[in-house]
Design a protein with these regions (language model features):
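Acidic, metal-coordinating helix/loop segments flanking the phosphotransfer/catalytic sites
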Residues: 32-56
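The feature encodes the CheY-like receiver
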Residues: 63-65, 94
Length: 123
């Protein structure tokens, strides 16, 4: 079963992604985090336990403390995470936001509300 890490500071969006997973009956192990740092620490723990890497990580563009682009750039600089698909999501449809996400190393940019089946198609 594919593994998805989802990072968003909004409790509503964290609830929504799990709701959509159930509603769309998407076969995915979903792990949600409210901060970029929590997601990064979880990834490092997965490596230590030799559990493999998640297939996809999607992070919200705008979060306090560290943005989604900050997390993506951090993961791209670390070879241990080179095989993971990385995406940015946002309620923004601004071209500048999309370009900034891709420049940080994101493989794709998604507008909210999210379509979980569409995310998994990006594997």
């Amino acid at each position: 079963m594919p593994i998805l890490f989802y990072v968003d500071d909004s409790r509503d969006d964290l609830f929504y992604i799990d709701y959509i997973r159930k509603k769309q009956k998407v076969d995915v192990d979903l792990f949600c985090f409210s901060t970029a740092e929590a997601a990064f620490e979880a990834l490092e723990e997965w490596l230590e336990r030799d559990e493999g890497m998640p297939d996809i990580l999607v992070a919200d563009l705008y979060m306090p403390l560290d943005s989604g682009t900050g997390l993506i750039a951090r993961l791209r600089r670390d070879e241990r995470f080179s095989g993971m698909r990385l995406g940015i999501c946002s309620g923004s449809d601004a071209v500048e936001d999309r370009e900034r996400a891709l420049a940080a190393g994101a493989d794709f940019y998604l507008e909210k509300p999210l379509d979980l089946a569409g995310i998994m198609d990006n594997r």
